Amino acid sequence: MLIPVVCFTCGFPIGTYAAIFDKARTEYIKTKMDGTLPQNIPLDASLQIELKDLITALGIPMRVCCRTHLITTLDYRKYY
């Protein structure tokens, strides 16, 4: 699924922050996984990487519903 342009719940424009968050998420996962790209990490249900503080660190003013859309959406074009 692609990241929505606006939040389905509150209407906040998520699309304007999607590229910033995606770049920061890639760098954050690289540092947590010792330089491995997110595309090369094997699927493992026990692997947990907390991303909730990343939005706060970037200074993006979002509600919980918007955070959920950004964190849980995976752009399949990068993996297939």
UniProtKB/Swiss-Prot annotation:
Molecular function in Gene Ontology: DNA binding; DNA-directed RNA polymerase activity; zinc ion binding
> At the top level of its lineage, which domain of life is listed?
Viruses
Q: Which residues cross the membrane?
A: none
**Which residues does the record give as Zn(2+) binding sites?**
7, 10, 65-66
Q: What is its main location?
A: host cell
Q: Name one GO biological process term.
A: DNA-templated transcription
The record's Gene3D superfamilies line, in alphabetical order, gives: Homeodomain-like (1.10.10.60)
Entry keyword annotation includes Phosphoprotein: no
- What InterPro entries does the database record attribute to this sequence? RNA_pol_su_RPB10, RNA_pol_suN_Zn-BS, RPABC5/Rpb10
Q: Name one GO cellular component term.
A: host cell cytoplasm
* Cell compartments where the protein resides: Host cytoplasm
Q: Which UniProt keywords apply?
A: DNA-directed RNA polymerase, Host cytoplasm, Metal-binding, Transcription, Viral transcription, Zinc
The annotated subunit structure for this chain is:
Part of the viral DNA-directed RNA polymerase that consists of 8 polII-like subunits (RPB1, RPB2, RPB3, RPB5, RPB6, RPB7, RPB9, RPB10), a capping enzyme and a termination factor.
Family label: Belongs to the archaeal RpoN/eukaryotic RPB10 RNA polymerase subunit family.
Q: What does this protein do?
A: Component of the DNA-directed RNA polymerase (RNAP) that catalyzes the transcription in the cytoplasm of viral DNA into RNA using the four ribonucleoside triphosphates as substrates.
What is the protein's given name?
DNA-directed RNA polymerase RPB10 homolog
Q: Which organism is it from?
A: African swine fever virus (strain Badajoz 1971 Vero-adapted)
The beginning of the lineage is: Viruses, Varidnaviria, Bamfordvirae, Nucleocytoviricota, Pokkesviricetes
